[in-house]
């Protein structure tokens, strides 16, 4: 597979319409095996993923979407529900044996813990999109879901918090609008 700038960045697009075929379990595992290598603070790895990969589960996910995202969701055969785990710190003994106080996070105020988990899960989410594209698939990342419904149907008895959904598969390139502009370096960056 070509891990080129074109594949991952310059020619890759966010899709809103897909062909409906689902990915194989091998494909989903390959995406995760690359995405899990994302950098996170103290190797915290708070991202949790529910791969939705059957017609029945995709329909359940579509029903959790707000009106404007339901049809988009129904066009995809697979999706990744991305969440962050508020109990991420319970894995530090395995993930970060170098830490002197691996349980200190459990004493943090809930808002600080959530900011930490979300920031690091977002790093991993970016890698998830890059990994999916690198393996030759298209993505459709989006919010716009009833988070309580997603939690009820897909997260069960966990402390996972909904972040976003990424539709997966082969996008319908004919349904794409022209790429929107991006901010110039001078408008978005500073060098000090």
Q: What are the functions of these language-model segments?
A:
Residues 63-64, 94-95, 153:
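Residue-level signal for well-ordered alpha-helical positions
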Residues 173-192:
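C-terminal domain-closing interface element
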Residues 66-68, 97-98, 156, 182-183:
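Short, solvent-exposed amphipathic alpha-helical segments in soluble enzyme
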Residues 35-37, 80, 99-153:
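Small-aliphatic-rich amphipathic alpha-helix that forms the alpha element of a beta-alpha
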Residues 88-104:
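Carboxylate-rich helix-loop segments that flank metal/cofactor sites and access channels
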Residues 70-73, 79-82, 156-175:
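A glycine-rich helix N-cap at a beta->alpha junction
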Residues 54, 151-152, 159:
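Short Asp/Glu-rich motifs
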Residues 1-91, 189-192:
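N-terminal amphipathic, basic helical "cap/leader" segment at the start of enzyme domains
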């Amino acid at each position: 597979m070509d891990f080129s700038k074109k594949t991952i960045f310059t020619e890759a697009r966010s899709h809103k319409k897909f062909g409906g075929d689902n990915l194989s379990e091998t494909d989903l595992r390959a995406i995760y095996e690359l995405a899990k290598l994302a950098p996170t603070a103290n190797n915290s790895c708070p991202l949790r993923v529910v791969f939705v990969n059957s017609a029945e589960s995709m329909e359940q996910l579509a029903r959790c979407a707000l009106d404007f995202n339901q049809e988009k969701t129904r066009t995809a055969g697979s999706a990744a529900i991305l969440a962050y785990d508020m109990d991420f710190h319970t894995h530090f003994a395995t993930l970060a044996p170098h830490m002197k106080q691996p349980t200190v996070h459990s004493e943090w105020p809930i808002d600080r813990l959530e900011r930490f988990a979300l920031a690091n899960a977002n790093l991993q989410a970016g890698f998830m999109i890059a990994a999916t594209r690198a393996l030759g698939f298209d993505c459709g990342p989006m919010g716009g879901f009833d988070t309580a419904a997603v939690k009820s149907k897909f997260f069960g008895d966990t402390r996972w918090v909904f972040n976003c959904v990424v539709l997966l598969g082969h996008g319908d390139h004919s349904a794409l609008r022209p790429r929107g502009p991006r901010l110039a370096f001078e408008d978005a960056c500073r060098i000090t």
